């Protein structure tokens, strides 16, 4: 739909129908929900189809490292992560570190978040460069996830 203020202007307006995966992200809950939906491979492939690759800023990093004794289930992890603890039903961005004894469930952890030993997170969204210190417990709900601001230490 073309906005009425542009009709009759000197602008050249074109449109193209898009029938692929769409998500309406308007608040923290929808951001949380839509990220966790990407754990389902069907949704991930619909958003990032192989025939139309999405090119992003390159950050050459090591593959994710799973240390002996770690546990990961039903999660989507980017490169550069180091997992020593437990991760369940999460989306982890590049460079996230989950230390030994830490438990992370139903979370979206952005780039370079560090979850130190013994910390427990459930229904948490962290912005990038966040540090959750040892033995801290943060718990939200699926309808009201906890959000930690960029570069904060909790």
Briefly describe each language-model feature range.
Residues 4-7, 35, 125:
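Residue-level recognition of well-ordered secondary-structure positions
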Residues 1-8, 12-13:
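Single conserved hydrophobic/aromatic residue that forms the stacking wall/gate
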Residues 5-8, 20, 26, 80, ...:
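Glycine-centered flexibility sites
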Residues 14-94, 103:
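Extended, small-residue-rich solenoid/repeat segments and analogous flexible loops
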Residues 60-154:
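Structural signal for interior beta-strand "rungs" in well-ordered beta-sheet cores
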